[in-house]
Amino acid sequence: MGSLNNEVGSIKCEVGSLKSENSFTKLPSEESLASESKKVTPVSSDFELNCGSLAPTSLSFPAMKFEDDIEIQSPDNSIWESFFADHLEGDFMISSPVRNLPSPQPASSFSSSHNNGNNNNNNYNIYAHRQGIHGQDMMMCSPPRSPLGLYNHPSHKGKGLSPLQKVFNSPNNQFMQIESFNLPALESFLDDDYDKEEDLASSYSTLKVSGTGVAGSSSESFDALSVVPDDLLECLALPSSLSNTSGGFMESLLSDTSAVQVINPDDEIFRTGSIAPLSQQLHQERQQEKQQKQRPVTHARPQQQQIINHNVLVPLAAAPDQEQDSGLQLVHLLLACAEAVSKEDYMLARRYLHHLNRVVTPLGDSMQRVASCFTEALSARLAATLATKPSTSALKPFNPFPPNSLEILKIYQILYQACPYVKFAHFTANQAIFEAFEAEERVHIIDLDILQGYQWPAFMQALAARPGGAPFLRITGVGPSPEAVRETGRCLTELAHSLHVPFEFHPVGEQLEDLKPHMFNRRVGEALAVNSVNRLHRVPVNCIGNLLAMIRDQAPNIVTIVEQEASHNGPYFLGRFLEALHYYSAIFDSLDATFPADSSQRAKLEQYIFAPEIMNIVSCEGPERVVRHERLEKWRRLMEGKGFKGVALSANAVTQSKILLGLYSCDGYKLTEDDGCLLLGWQDRAILAASAWRC
């Protein structure tokens, strides 16, 4: 099926000065890094997973092994060559998913076509192609952003238009405005067969879309056809094997020292049995996929009859246009059901859900899988609404990861290694903090969501290689579980000791809304940075202002914020639903291009990371709804309202992000600049936004 990427957040007051964009700190050269490394005790090569805590027992992962020594070449950025070449050997660095990295691109390929030709000063003309992101976001996108360099070249188009993209990129997209959103009624195909299981497959009518989108105006409508069971089944059936655009991506994703284990479909998730690398698992999956492709598809009609008889959708060969029609129908059914829920027409919503449950599956293409997540979320919302004694406490509390710590580590590591999203957030924030700490002898970082501490080993190594030696580093780690935060601190302390970095860790086991100034243990003479990655959106609306004011009063040198670029906190349910469908469709599409078809690793990411987010956004209200993503413009207004000023991310940060994306064979990832901030997206839909601030 085609792409589903439609368009689906620093601070020191009179303490120090930040460097201008033309004088950003450069990391040490390769020679100095090599000489410094000889003085440093090497990091332990054993990575032990702790099943009883939220954090690993050691942050010293085994070195990544490549067939050849790989060096990221950049003629005008020798500092980055040494940095990345040294850190390609660790899981917390840029772990290249492509073992046989192609020859480096010329320096000009990393800059816009209007580059002035001076490649020796790290001056990237990132404003040369300033323009709006291709396609307008449905909830009023941010001001015009400029695509950056090679990864936004027209030749890198990725996959084609998807059903959702056709809907959102429609020339007439007034329906994006919630006030005017009006889906046509679909009762005609829902009338007589709702309670007749034996007649459902034959009476299900196909939907046709008018030329400009779902519902450009009230005059637009679906054409409810009569009985067409065969064509419908062909259209809604899943393809036997999904097309894979990643080429040889997964065969060389990770080294043989990866800590991810073989997952047997018959065993429990992440059973600690025989150990094998993630690359080997994915290689096996691709081999199975190739074998399935070689088998001739026969007896399609009996399979369709089996679908009717057993009420189960099984993979069938489907033409691209049939997949497109199927995707469009799923989109329209989802939107119609969401509109019925928003209008409190629960009987009609139940009818739509009844049909959705018959045609969606978590095992199909990206549209089928994302539709399955949203169908489940709509069902949960409707069930809670229609309960005899409604109680929000009956809903499971939101937890973005499974409770078992070993599963947390493994799933998070899959996401960290296979996709650039988390690395982009960590490296971009680290670069801004590193530059703000230039020449400082005592530095303090407050991490508002420390988790397993994955962000900081690379930063520690950069400090250890700094000319003149590493400064004294203190990290205050914040997290809801005191035990987990302390365990992360123990691991980071061991790593800092091995790197000869003077280090102190201060754990704070509190929710962000419960933080008090004395918990930061601020000390005179320390340069302070506050870091938040995908965390501030979960702070209650009535607490976020006080939290930011308290951070401002600490007079930090820099505040780094990375947040999901989505508007999932609007006042209207239908608007949140539309935005979430758009956003997660792009994410699922990027996973489709990254993993092979029927990948168990991809299924775990979707089931344990993204599906719970969708469930919380769609099914929960009030205090139970904690996934409240906001767009960059909202964070910008909020930060400026609390006395912060934006700090433009440097050319080095842009270069670093481009090198990171160059390590992934998928060509759908896009890097965009927006008034000094960087956005990483899939195709024309921004996914993450990174920004830096000071007071």
UniProtKB/Swiss-Prot annotation:
Cellular compartment(s): Nucleus; Cytoplasm
Basic and acidic residues bias spans: 283-292
Short motif VHIID, span: 443-447
Primary residence: nucleus
Region described as PFYRE: spans on this chain: 528-616
PROSITE patterns, A to Z: GRAS
Induction: Accumulates after inoculation with Rhizophagus irregularis.
Disruption phenotype: Ineffective symbiosis with arbuscular mycorrhiza (AM) fungi (e.g. Rhizophagus irregularis, Simiglomus hoi and Acaulospora scrobiculata), with rare colonizations characterized by malformed arbuscules. Reduced AM fungi-mediated induction of AM-related genes involved at later stages of symbiosis (e.g. VAPYRIN, PT4, PT5, STR, STR2, RAM2, SBT and BCP).
Domain GRAS: 321-694
Keywords: Cytoplasm, Nucleus, Transcription, Transcription regulation
Sequence segments annotated as region (SAW): 619-694
Record GO biological process: arbuscular mycorrhizal association; regulation of DNA-templated transcription; response to symbiotic fungus
Motif LxCxE motif: positions: 335-339
Annotated spans, Leucine repeat II (LRII): 487-518
A GO CC term attached to the entry: cytoplasm
Region (Leucine repeat I (LRI)): 328-393
Region feature Disordered, mapped onto this chain: 281-304
Positions of the UniProt region annotated as VHIID: 412-477
Biological role stated in the UniProt entry: Transcription factor acting as a central regulator of arbuscular mycorrhiza (AM)-related genes involved at later stages of symbiosis (e.g. VAPYRIN, PT4, PT5, STR, STR2, RAM2, SBT and BCP) but not required for early genes of AM (e.g. common symbiosis signaling genes). Required for the morphogenesis of arbuscules upon symbiosis with AM fungi (e.g. Rhizophagus irregularis, Simiglomus hoi and Acaulospora scrobiculata). Also involved in restricting mycorrhizal colonization of the root meristem.
Family listed: Belongs to the GRAS family.
Subunit structure: Forms homodimer in nucleus and cytoplasm. Interacts with NSP2, RAD1 and TF80.
Name this protein carries in UniProt: GRAS family protein RAM1
Species per Swiss-Prot/TrEMBL record: Petunia hybrida (Petunia)
